[in-house]
């Protein structure tokens, strides 16, 4: 198969995606990565062949069609496991690598995972948890040391691939011929919390293929000449759908980053022309640019150059590559486009990057929509907006619960409301949670995102920043505040709390706890003493939580929170 034009190919399921990628791009490099200090590559053909070999091995050992978890750092074999499980009729469960041991065990039990695939950082840690995960009968290390490989419960990834390849060579077509139910769950993504409050998002092949197709149709600026440096967590739905499925479908090349501390070095070395990032990375890049400019006393000169460059562009002369080469060389010198989603970026940041020669396209997504919902298209972007709805889905604004429409119209020109989505990318529901599933769908079948915004006359969507509950951190991670509030409610000294995301002094959105202490326990105490007592208790709580869920800022209130007649805190009053 050869592509005759720039229109991306569309696929009905993940197996078709990997197969047609191999047919289209063959021995072209898909992944570049480092292992034990050595640079290695994986081609599109190798990606397809490895999937079939591992899937065939799964069929031989009773794992085909079962639930398999995967956890760890970025590695091509992570995606091999993802494809092998889902394309054999089974379910993959990507786990957050920041989970505690207890949370890992709880999620494994909840998902009923029969095996777990993991990268080097989890050697020994997972096998040591075997007693806490009795349902997990096989541990599959990707990069084992001798001790891990010899463990009685492990079978290494390379061993399984060799087993599967031998079976394929002998004519075993069990895995190759399996019929996929495209409407059945193939991916289970836990959004937040422990088993008491977690929501497991169920996505099908149809959901993921639809989201991938939509991403490709919305990002026509990317093609088989595009190069990316991958820098996002592998369990993140944005990373998998947009950063692996869509990028591979377009024939692009990806360098898999070997640690956050090496991102800048790898950008400079591998010279990407395209990136998909979360706001934290972009904001960090932006701060570094201006910090360096200020250190050299060049701010006025750069600002003057920006004005001159912008004036020249208006008459068709683009001098950005000359004027700002010293700035863009820090990112390899060839970066032209960044797609960014997860939290809003400042318009000034977007304008400055554009002035330097790098276009930022903001988008919007949510795990329950696999995840892409909207994105700004190349040449058609609008500041403050997350773009228009992608193919495969529709968006509407539900203003039925908005009692301040006149104020909204005065402020934005349009009434705000809850962003609702309908389409082929919308999840099957929450795993074993009919009540939660029912709560997020309207009577006519639209998914309630829980985010508030408005849509202009041209269909551009704007998120006003007033979320219903979900906190989106600067690194793109999602946190449900109810979970943290539940933990705080167990502290006797705390009477009421509201957890939200606020920007700290560095401009990063962090978990912030607003606390109303029990006045009966602090009679005669000064506010400073109350603060220190609560701070110590929250420090102890933080030790039990993953880093991204830890409370970073504390504010002590003098009065109770305002409440509804049903005694629920009016969260929007403290946002």
How would you label these PLM feature ranges?
Residues 41-45, 186-212:
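Conserved AMP-binding A3 loop
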Residues 99, 116, 423, 428-429, ...:
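AMP-binding/adenylate-forming catalytic core of the ANL superfamily
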